[in-house]
Amino acid sequence: MVDERTPLKAVTTREDAPTAVMRPKPVGKSIFALSILGTLSAASISLFSMYGQTLQHKLGFTQVQVNSVSISSLLGMYLLMPVIGYLGDTYGSNYLALFSWITFPASYSIASGIFSTAADWHRETGEALPRAAPEMALCFFFIGASTSCMYYASLKASAHSMSVYFAEDGKLQTYTPGYAIWGPVAAFGLSSLWQSQLLRAVFITGKNVNVAGIFLFFAGLYAVICGIIFFSCRTAESMASELRKKAEASTDCNCDGPGHEGATLKEFFTDKTAWLFLLCFVFIGGPFEMFQNNMGAILDTVTVENADSPSFSTHVSLFATFSTVSRLVVGFSSEAMESHVSRPVLLSVIALVAACIHLMVPSGIFTVFDNAKYFSVVTIVNGFSYGSSFTLVPTIVTKVWGIANLGTIWGSFILALAVGSLGYGLLFAKVYDAASEVGVGSMSQVCSGVHCYGLTFVITGTGLAFAAAAVFFIWVFMWKKRGIHM
């Protein structure tokens, strides 16, 4: 019989149902809730823009130095993700939680001290403290790494806490419900919302930003939350190990190590659908990252007559709101409609809608017609699609390759996203700079008009359409034939 990895209710209704089903203990629900709490607190790194310029004003940093601090955090978070995932898969996610428990509070505490010392130096001398920028960059590198460790540890604990183990055809099988994956992912998206509101209410007064206070707050927060996640991971892994042993002992099970929870790394990297799906994620995630990072530049190209220019802050809020809403809506709906609409089909439809919008942007209907009145449509669709992809893709990854090497595999997808973000970001910059030299505003670095971004959106729209078709093809002609249900 083919390994179908179907939902457990489908498995247990068959005549040849498994002889024993090992369901999570009641404590599993508590671990799941604590995992949600972990990712709901993990996205402090995304708030850098709220205090980044204060480093320039109060510490005398150049813009290059400010950017170096921000880039260091991204390097720690994205580039180390596959390594962090591999270490978690091999040695246990509790070690990653322990690492974040140590480095998160320590890095933020040290950063607070550096800020206070550098601020005093700048007030007295009018110059930047020479060692402040590299030291701050090093702190934020570890903050980025701690973010990935905490995120992955929470995700793996959630997966273990809700997974069901059963023996079928002499082999141990695992079923992980979709909400055990998209739940923590959606919570991570919500994290920056409540944290940003708290910072505005407590640490920001007008243009005055209490950066040292912000750093100390996060140091205290993570000293508590990371400790909770550490003990949750230990409990989750212990419970999962016990359930596996009971399922193995319940029948004549020919189990050969951790592969029964999903694909081995060799199986993943030799699976041609893995590389195709990675490529699809580059073409899906890259355009949304590009739009998010260059939204201000796009809005600056819009020329309006007798009207106010579109508000950048309004569109940032729209993007964030619909990104968050989509994580919840798509997460719940994909779970509820699992037996009717598969997640790859849902991802294809969302990518196709986004492709249509991107291909319509060069026409000027959203940016030129009626003083850019309908530009919000572009923002909403990109925000919704961005959040949806971060809900659907990790769930699909789990359904296809299991949770045995979830950290390494999902880390590879995060790395693919970084490649897409970099590639499409460079594309936007090249098109923008080329247009500014020949179009309106050619005497300055500022570009105005559709030609500043038209070619970029044609390419992103085409890439999204290709990815939508490719995901649908992979699902219908490859995954479905393997008997994978999602």
From Swiss-Prot:
Annotated keywords: Membrane, Transmembrane, Transmembrane helix, Transport, Vacuole
Compartment(s) of residence: Vacuole membrane
InterPro entries named in the record: MFS, MFS_trans_sf
Superkingdom per UniProt: Eukaryota
Gene Ontology CC: fungal-type vacuole membrane
TM helices/strands, residue ranges: 31-51, 68-88, 95-115, 135-155, 174-194, 211-231, 268-288, 312-333, 349-369, 377-397, 409-429, 457-477
One Pfam family recorded for the sequence: MFS_1
Keyword Transport: yes
Bilayer topology: Multi-pass membrane protein
MF GO annotations: transmembrane transporter activity
Keyword Methyltransferase: no
CDD domains named among the record's database cross-references: MFS_Mch1p_like
Function: Probable transporter.
Family, per entry: Belongs to the major facilitator superfamily.
Protein name: Probable transporter MCH1
Gene coding for it: MCH1
